[in-house]
A protein has these predicted regions:
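Bacterial N-terminal signal peptides that target proteins for export
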Residues: 1-11
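A structural boundary/capping signal
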Residues: 21-226
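Bacterial N-terminal signal peptides
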Residues: 9-19
Length: 226
């Protein structure tokens, strides 16, 4: 198993450079509604950008989110289904898909373009679960070291209770499993709308200081106003 220390040091250094680690003031959390608040105008724009199938994908996605929100089922069933449904999006590296090395797509961009990488899957699952009623405190987008891939990776961790072992939603597998069963993943840091946690250090500041997150939120706001 690769040592965690070098990866953790690099992650902490990056967060320090971004101003995340430290006693930062809490920022307003992101409102619910981004995931299904897709207007006809936005669908038209993304159809022009990503092709005629974009509209079909976005309409189907909105229908699914609305119907799933009203459907009965256990918490675990919801996690399994959301993980499986969004994993159907094709995996595409950022450089090939967006022409950038590290681009965090909005859920509407990922769905309409039918392309995502690990961050994009995680972001889409996060916003969809939040819209379906999952409390923000239970959700953490989590950077890990993937032992299998030997590279950085992102997953969504779901905490049924504050002191509970998290369940892992991963684009690499449809099955949702407890973190203790994912020995192939070494956690580095995690965040949600409200806070950042660095492994072995605990709470470390506000996610608004993470550049890619701030850029993503700005694009989500523009989508909502379209």
């Amino acid at each position: 198993m690769p040592p965690i220390r070098p990866l953790l040091v690099l992650a902490c250094a990056a967060l320090l450079a971004a101003g995340v680690i430290g006693g930062l003031e809490a920022q307003p959390r992101v409102e619910r509604g981004f995931t299904t608040a897709v207007s006809d105008r936005l669908i038209e724009l993304y159809s022009q950008r990503f092709g005629p199938l974009a509209a079909e994908r976005l309409h189907a996605w909105k229908r699914y989110a609305r119907s799933r929100g009203a459907a009965p089922g256990s918490e675990r069933e919801l996690l399994e289904e959301v993980n499986r449904v969004l994993n159907r999006i094709a995996f595409v590296e950022d450089a090939a898909h967006w022409g950038e090395e590290d681009y965090w797509a909005t859920p509407a961009e990922s769905v309409s373009s039918n392309g995502a990488d690990c961050e994009d899957y995680t972001i889409a699952k996060y916003f969809l679960l939040k819209e379906l009623g999952a409390p923000i405190a239970r959700l953490r987008m989590t950077y890990v070291k993937s032992v299998k891939l030997n590279q950085a990776h992102m997953v969504l961790a779901y905490y049924p209770r504050p002191d509970a072992e998290p369940l892992v939603l991963d684009n690499l597998e449809d099955r949702v499993r407890p973190a203790s069963q994912r020995t192939d993943l070494i956690p580095v840091y995690s965040f949600n709308d409200e806070e950042v946690w660095v492994e072995m250090r605990g709470r470390s500041g506000s996610p608004t200081q993470i550049r890619n997150w701030s850029a993503l939120i700005a694009r989500l706001e523009r989508e909502r106003r379209t």
